Amino acid sequence: MMVPVRCFTCGNVVGEHWEEFKARTREAEEPEDPEKVLDELGVERHCCRRMLVSHKDLVDIVSPYQ
């Protein structure tokens, strides 16, 4: 649904990186490597990285049913 604000495992804030991560890896004409983007954003822990890499934004799909 919506990107989590904090990592489920360690509690670090990850939501602040979502918009830039999405823009650079999914919506760009030439998408960048997610590993490089996360390194540049300063997301170091693997638990926090998986929160951004594995997120699927379903808000637009689910919202008509609410």
Swiss-Prot record:
GO BP annotation list: DNA-templated transcription
Keyword Metal-binding belongs to the record: yes
Cofactor binding, note field: Binds 1 zinc ion.
Annotated coiled-coil segments of the chain: none
GO CC annotation terms, alphabetical: cytoplasm; DNA-directed RNA polymerase complex
HAMAP family found in the cross-reference section: RNApol_arch_Rpo10 (MF_00250)
Entry-linked PANTHER family: DNA-DIRECTED RNA POLYMERASES I, II, AND III SUBUNIT RPABC5, DNA-DIRECTED RNA POLYMERASES I, II, AND III SUBUNIT RPABC5 FAMILY MEMBER
This protein's name: DNA-directed RNA polymerase subunit Rpo10
